[in-house]
Amino acid sequence: MPSSVTALGQARSSGPGMAPSACCCSPAALQRRLPILAWLPSYSLQWLKMDFVAGLSVGLTAIPQALAYAEVAGLPPQYGLYSAFMGCFVYFFLGTSRDVTLGPTAIMSLLVSFYTFHEPAYAVLLAFLSGCIQLAMGVLRLGFLLDFISYPVIKGFTSAAAVTIGFGQIKNLLGLQNIPRPFFLQVYHTFLRIAETRVGDAVLGLVCMLLLLVLKLMRDHVPPVHPEMPPGVRLSRGLVWAATTARNALVVSFAALVAYSFEVTGYQPFILTGETAEGLPPVRIPPFSVTTANGTISFTEMVQDMGAGLAVVPLMGLLESIAVAKAFASQNNYRIDANQELLAIGLTNMLGSLVSSYPVTGSFGRTAVNAQSGVCTPAGGLVTGVLVLLSLDYLTSLFYYIPKSALAAVIIMAVAPLFDTKIFRTLWRVKRLDLLPLCVTFLLCFWEVQYGILAGALVSLLMLLHSAARPETKVSEGPVLVLQPASGLSFPAMEALREEILSRALEVSPPRCLVLECTHVCSIDYTVVLGLGELLQDFQKQGVALAFVGLQVPVLRVLLSADLKGFQYFSTLEEAEKHLRQEPGTQPYNIREDSILDQKVALLKA
């Protein structure tokens, strides 16, 4: 509860949840691979109480969401619950964030529906293969590859996913049946058949949405509980906090109770979830082939059918989970290990496939509940996992009465925050060009998810390459021409730099001396060295000088190693300008050949 979070604030910011420091020593290396060893020795009874409350709160949120997300994935409802518990146990041992909860999410469920054709066997196999890919990325420390997906691309995808998922639940909210799943067909048929709306489902769905909104607003405005408050005030605020935190479970239970009340009267105005397979899932290897009425689909054919999903699903799963982990680590003042997170997510999906789970990742909503509940360690996930298992074993018969419109309300309210309207205004104000990859991703994701992500990433990459090939330069006109590249120099930029130098210094009458100010150049490659050598020759032919200023040690070392004819450099711009204003034939100002040789020997030995 809020008071406990405050009381444990210092312990939570300095103890568990911190990624162990990378060290070659055996204990540190073991802690890095098994983060539980870093916080378990100092585990306390106070942390146990906080973790229990947080785990219970997350569990009451996870169960109705799991049922709802299975609908988004196009799978029977029990598969949502099958996917909701394995991450709790794996992350207990391997996670580096105390706040993150792994399980089914709206975005993962949407991707699963795209690539598994609503077939549980495909979904389970996709979880296994995604886990293998994610685990391999963690072992090979390939987490840096995620940095090539820019923030506008991620925002474009999540916004499109929010629209797709939210609109996809309108049919359940209104009680419409036999609506096709492809987005554009879904929009067309929903409006075409709007007159077929079932009043009972629509009213119940809207009431559930209103209740969820009111409870969320109450949750956001519940004042923190302080120990000095009177017991009655603390109790009342604690009850409000508990009720608003478990709002999904309360609303779904309310809707199920209403539906059951109608059922006993013999009249049912709602479309119900229906039968849910009872009991715990069997432990078995993922299906590497599927037998249908038309024959057996081999493993190779299943992989071919999933196609781009084998890249998109593991990639987006990692992006979503690490983004959530980093956000809460920054908020709560601790660090995570991104590569260790890859291992945790990968192993979760691999082991989850043994219990019929579809791909999972970090959930922003449930992680927020976890953090706000005052969780102290990943042990809170154990309570959540046990609660999900108990619901599978004892409550599945009650899920029959949950109206689909109530689950649709839960999904719509969960994905609404994913559509970030502020990002469009922010990018318009900060850098309008970044709207291009965002809009490309957003629009194309309505066609095919992989095309949207690929096109957005490609546009971002082209923008990056263009800035590398055409770096901005600052030019100072004076007695001596000074040209300063605003960023580093690499081989794509050399031709553009050469053209600008020639046009400003040598293709004018009379030719002018030039100082190349290289303060912002941190490194150069061999192509740049060759280009600079050619420029030095061009300047010598015209009888003017090209001097270098502000060379950093790595750059100077490379240029001295190349033995460029006519190469001269100065420590300050004033020295270079004073030298270049002298008559031809004089020695460089404040620099001698022997000092160049001494510096060259010293740099090459460094």
From Swiss-Prot:
Family membership noted in the UniProt record: Belongs to the SLC26A/SulP transporter (TC 2.A.53) family.
Keyword Phosphoprotein among record annotations: no
Cytoplasmic topological domain residue ranges: 73, 118-119, 169-197, 272-307, 363-374, 420-441
GO biological process: chloride transmembrane transport; monoatomic ion transport; oxalate transport; sulfate transmembrane transport
Boundaries of every STAS domain copy: 470-584
GO terms assigned for molecular function: chloride channel activity; chloride:bicarbonate antiporter activity; monoatomic anion transmembrane transporter activity; secondary active sulfate transmembrane transporter activity; sulfate transmembrane transporter activity
Pfam assignment, any one: STAS
Keyword Cytoplasm: no
Organism of origin: Homo sapiens
Regions that span the bilayer: 52-72, 74-94, 101-117, 120-140, 148-168, 198-218, 251-271, 308-328, 342-362, 375-395, 399-419, 442-462
Protein name: Sodium-independent sulfate anion transporter
Cell location: Cell membrane; Lysosome membrane; Apical cell membrane; Basolateral cell membrane
PROSITE patterns, per database record: SLC26A (PS01130), STAS (PS50801)
A cellular component term, taken from the record's GO annotations: membrane
Membrane topology (Extracellular): 1-51, 95-100, 141-147, 219-250, 329-341, 396-398, 463-606
Expressed in which tissues: Detected in all tissues tested with highest expression observed in brain, kidney, HEVEC and placenta and lowest in pancreas, skeletal muscle, liver, lung and heart.
UniProtKB keywords: Anion exchange, Cell membrane, Ion transport, Lysosome, Membrane, Transmembrane, Transmembrane helix, Transport
Membrane topology label: Multi-pass membrane protein
Chemical reaction(s) catalysed: hydrogencarbonate(in) + chloride(out) = hydrogencarbonate(out) + chloride(in); sulfate(in) + H(+)(in) = sulfate(out) + H(+)(out); oxalate(in) + chloride(out) = oxalate(out) + chloride(in)
Entry function: Sodium-independent anion exchanger mediating bicarbonate, chloride, sulfate and oxalate transport. Exhibits sodium-independent sulfate anion transporter activity that may cooperate with SLC26A2 to mediate DIDS-sensitive sulfate uptake into high endothelial venules endothelial cells (HEVEC). In the kidney, mediates chloride-bicarbonate exchange, facilitating V-ATPase-mediated acid secretion. May function as a chloride channel, playing an important role in moderating chloride homeostasis and neuronal activity in the cerebellum.
